[in-house]
Swiss-Prot record:
The RNA-binding motif binds to the RRE, a stem-and-loop structure present in incompletely spliced viral pre-mRNAs. This region also contains the NLS which mediates nuclear localization. These overlapping functions prevent Rev bound to RRE from undesirable return to the nucleus. When Rev binds the RRE, the NLS becomes masked while the NES remains accessible. It comes from Simian immunodeficiency virus (isolate F236/smH4) (SIV-sm). Keywords: Host cytoplasm, Host nucleus, mRNA transport, RNA-binding, Transport. The gene is rev. Pfam families: REV. GO terms for cellular component: host cell cytoplasm; host cell nucleolus. This is Protein Rev. A motif (Nuclear export signal) lies at residues 68-80. A motif (Nuclear localization signal and RNA-binding (RRE)) lies at residues 31-47. Residues 14-23 are annotated as: Homomultimerization. Residues 19-40, 81-101 are annotated as: Disordered.
């Protein structure tokens, strides 16, 4: 097996691992709002995983003469991050427009 095929197999195994370690599709009790919120959070995590898998698949192979530390630093940028909560209030310019008739 050539090195490119081996690299492709390694990347595909990593992507498969990402898909296996994610949370399953949410099911269970709760109000309609709670179920909607759980599905929305699950969809957001799933979109992050798909984007991460795409970046892993399309990530260029590091040149052979590149130090391993540099390649590791580049790969550390590929991470799933928690999404911030949406703001609870409107920005100031929008508040001023809403108050004045």
């Amino acid at each position: 097996m050539s090195s490119t095929e081996e690299e492709l197999r390694r990347r595909l195994r990593l992507i498969h691992f990402l898909h296996q370690t994610t949370d399953p599709y949410p099911q269970g009790p709760g109000t309609a709002n709670q179920r909607r919120r759980r599905r929305r959070r699950w969809r957001q995590r799933w979109q992050q995983i798909l984007a991460l898998a795409d970046r892993i698949y399309s990530f260029p192979d590091p040149p052979v003469d590149t130090p391993l530390d540099l390649a590791i630093q580049q790969l550390q940028g590929l991470a799933i991050e928690e999404l911030p909560d949406p703001p609870t209030s409107a920005p100031e310019p929008l508040n001023d427009v809403a108050k004045s008739p």
